[in-house]
UniProtKB/Swiss-Prot annotation:
The lineage of its organism: Eukaryota, Viridiplantae, Streptophyta, Embryophyta, Tracheophyta. It comes from Arabidopsis thaliana. CDD domains: serpinP_plants. GO terms for cellular component: cytosol; extracellular space. Induction: By beta-amino-butyric acid (BABA) and infection by Pseudomonas pathogen. This is Serpin-Z1. Residues 317-341 are annotated as: RCL. Keywords: Protease inhibitor, Serine protease inhibitor. The reactive center loop (RCL) extends out from the body of the protein and directs binding to the target protease. The protease cleaves the serpin at the reactive site within the RCL, establishing a covalent linkage between the carboxyl group of the serpin reactive site and the serine hydroxyl of the protease. The resulting inactive serpin-protease complex is highly stable. Disulfide bonds: none annotated. The keyword Coiled coil does not apply.
Length: 385
């Protein structure tokens, strides 16, 4: 098994999923979600009790040849990407998994061993028939604890009933400091232009240091590396900003990103440029939704899933968290050219993502239409968004 190729397939799936999630979101809304968190929940579903009933759909969706391959990818993520090395200066990462399963279901003891020892998950027998609401609150409390209190009320009222058999949950949080932090002294209010033709005044961070920026046909890419720990020899994290040249060009850029295999690896700024102007807005957003209909359109039917994520960007770095609950109911080689001065002023809608560079894992993806918008863009109670 080629682990590198398997990881590349997961990156491709993440971008396809991103295209569907972002394009299906309410028009002109700020969105943040975690493909990695959703992937983990789906992988546990495929490997867990009764997973054989949906494993064919899941393997097709994840472009994987077998459950063993999915488990190999999961192991790679757990040991490399999700290892918490904050004690040595790297990002603080927490990844937690859980399975709440109805006591009435006949299960092989091997599944308990699989979840506790391989997935490092909590395995909790519960009584959905008479205590559905109590279980919902328990899962929400677990998620809140494992996301540093950032994700609250993942499962909305009514999402867990007496007909629920299992809930697979994944919680993921990330907090990283920029390799080169921004000076708060240079933060100034400037106009951010909305797609309706108006503008809002928001705080923009700025720096006079050279930045990893590159211009492509119709858009620019900024890469902001995170500080690495002294023992982070086999991984590195960066946040990417994808800024269309046109103020209303986000939809076209999203379509290109989601439909072009290898898009991320072929659009990586590899050297630092001196910029004429450099500004990116501070922002804090939260977004929650039912993933069910998105997965249905992608071939994963009869899978009920809720997801919520949040991210905050400031002068020191980024803090992000995500949680997914799946309820079962009945580097490219760039040509290096001489540096030339360009601008990177993110004063209109853009895409962003947080990625581990060596495995290619996409932890978080989002879009900003209005950085002054309220923190919560959540709409988990609807069937779709």
């Amino acid at each position: 098994m080629d682990v590198r190729e398997a990881m590349k397939n997961q990156t491709h799936v993440a971008m396809i999923l991103s295209g569907h999630v972002l394009s299906s979101a309410p028009k002109d809304s700020n969105v943040i979600f975690s493909p990695a968190s959703i992937n983990s929940a789906i992988t546990m579903h495929a490997a867990g009790p009764g997973g054989d009933l949906v494993s064919g759909q899941i393997l097709s969706f994840l472009r994987s040849s077998s459950i063993d391959e999915l488990k190999t990818v999961f192991r790679e993520l757990a040991s490399v990407v999700y290892a918490d090395r904050s004690a040595t200066g790297g990002p603080k990462i927490t990844a937690a998994n859980g399975l709440w399963i109805d006591k009435s279901l006949p299960t092989d003891p091997k599944f308990k061993d699989l979840f506790e020892n391989f997935f490092k998950a909590v395995y909790v027998p519960v009584d959905f028939r008479s205590e559905a609401e109590e279980v919902r609150k328990e899962v929400n409390s677990w998620v809140e604890h494992h996301t540093n209190n950032l994700i609250k009320d993942l499962l909305p009222d009514g999402s867990v009933t007496s007909l629920t058999n299992k809930i697979y949950a994944n919680a993921l949080s990330f907090k990283g400091a920029w390799k080169r932090p921004f000076e708060k002294y240079y933060t100034r209010d400037n106009d951010f232009y909305l797609v309706n033709g108006t503008s809002v005044s928001v705080p923009f961070m700025s720096s006079y240091e050279n930045q990893y920026v590159r211009a492509y046909d119709g858009f620019k890419v900024l890469r902001l590396p995170y500080q690495r720990g002294s023992d982070d020899t086999n991984r590195k994290f960066s946040m990417y900003f994808y800024l269309p040249d046109k103020k209303d060009g986000l939809d076209d850029l999203l379509e290109k990103m989601a439909s072009t295999p290898g898009f991320l690896d072929s659009h990586i700024p590899t050297y630092r440029d001196e910029l004429e102007k450099f500004r990116i807005p501070k922002f804090k957003i939260e977004f929650g939704f039912s993933v069910t209909s998105v997965l249905d359109r992608l071939g994963l039917r009869s899978m009920s899933m809720y997801h919520k994520a949040c991210v905050e960007i400031d002068e020191e770095g980024a803090e992000a968290a995500a949680a997914t609950a799946d309820g079962d109911c009945g580097c490219s080689l760039d040509f290096v050219e001489p540096p030339k001065k360009i601008d990177f002023v993110a004063d209109h809608p853009f895409l962003f993502l947080i990625r581990e560079e060596k495995t290619g894992t996409v932890l978080f993806v989002g879009q900003i239409f209005d950085p002054s918008g309220p923190c919560s863009g959540s709409n988990s109670d609807s069937d779709d968004y």
